[in-house]
Design a protein with these regions (language model features):
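Phosphate-binding loop that captures ATP/GTP phosphates
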Residues: 33-36, 40-85, 191
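Residue-level signature of catalytic and energy-coupling elements of molecular machines
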Residues: 3, 14, 47, 80, ...
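Conserved Switch II/interswitch segment of TRAFAC-class P-loop GTPases
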Residues: 113-120, 126, 138-159
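Short glycine/serine/threonine-rich phosphate/pyrophosphate-binding segments
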Residues: 18-23, 45-46, 122-130, 152-155
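Phosphate-binding/switch loop-helix module in NTP-utilizing enzymes
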Residues: 83-133
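Walker A/P-loop phosphate-binding motif and the immediately C-terminal alpha-helix
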Residues: 5-39
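C-terminal lobe/tail of nucleotide-utilizing enzymes
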Residues: 162-239
Length: 239
């Protein structure tokens, strides 16, 4: 069977919570499906940190004369990450061809087994990494993550344009850090001046996630509180 569908989680702007969205969405899918995460963010891999497996390393085996990685299994998710390859305290200074080759090898040398969905945590930007994913990893869909800041929205529109040119279907957009909740009154407080994101970006908003300290780290006990609706929206589109 192999991997049935690949979903890239992407944002042109860094710092909008793409990795956190990827982790939580994959966890929701893992309740009903076989799921993996490929952390392809070579400049700032975070999945091994979010899933609290920083001290772990994928087992390396030789299969058919080739080196293979056995992914880490955590919270019913199979994970392989550039974070297992790179030093946490050192910057990756790789040029485009090296970056592209590393992402391709990480996916191909990992023994994923039979997966319903493989989520790819993309690097921010619209450069070589995007082209590699499109041409080599061939995602079935991409899901964009943004905040409502003017700069993030502008860059999300650029990212949308690139994926359209690459002919990769875009599921929609997740509006992250959209609002806060007052601890005193429970009142929902928008973090930005309200804008019509669907009109600005031209894509369906599949969920609005709050800015809350509970989501700065992955917590499976509260994940469903924030992501179950988004999970159902995404699943309805891709199934």
């Amino acid at each position: 069977m192999g991997i049935k569908q690949i979903i890239a989680i992407a944002s042109a702007k860094g710092g909008v919570g793409k990795s956190t969205i990827c982790t939580n969405l994959a966890f929701q899918f893992s309740k009903d499906f076989n799921v993996g995460i490929l952390d392809a963010d070579i400049y700032g891999p975070n999945q091994h940190i979010l899933l609290d497996v920083s001290e772990s390393k994928p087992e390396v085996k030789i299969l058919d004369g080739k080196k293979s990685f056995i992914p880490i299994k955590v919270n019913n998710i199979l994970l392989n990450s550039m974070g297992f390859v790179l030093d946490d305290d050192k910057a990756a200074m790789w040029r485009g061809p090296m970056l592209s080759g590393a992402i391709k090898q990480l996916k191909e040398l990992t023994q994923w087994g039979d997966l319903d969905y493989l989520f790819i945590d993309m690097p921010p930007g619209t450069g070589d990494a995007y082209l590699t994913v499109a041409s080599e990893l061939k995602p079935n869909y991409v899901l964009l993550v943004t905040s409502q800041s003017k700069l993030a929205v502008k860059d999300t529109i650029k990212s949308k344009s690139m994926f359209e040119r690459l002919k990769i279907p875009i599921i929609g957009v997740i509006d992250n850090m959209s609002y806060s909740v007052s601890f005193q009154s429970g009142e929902v407080v928008p973090d930005f001046s309200p804008i019509d994101l669907e009109h600005e970006i031209g894509l369906k908003i599949l969920g609005s996630i709050p800015r809350t300290k509970e989501l700065t780290a992955f917590n499976p006990e509260i994940s469903s509180n924030f992501f179950e609706t988004t999970y159902n929206e995404v699943l309805q589109i891709i199934e």
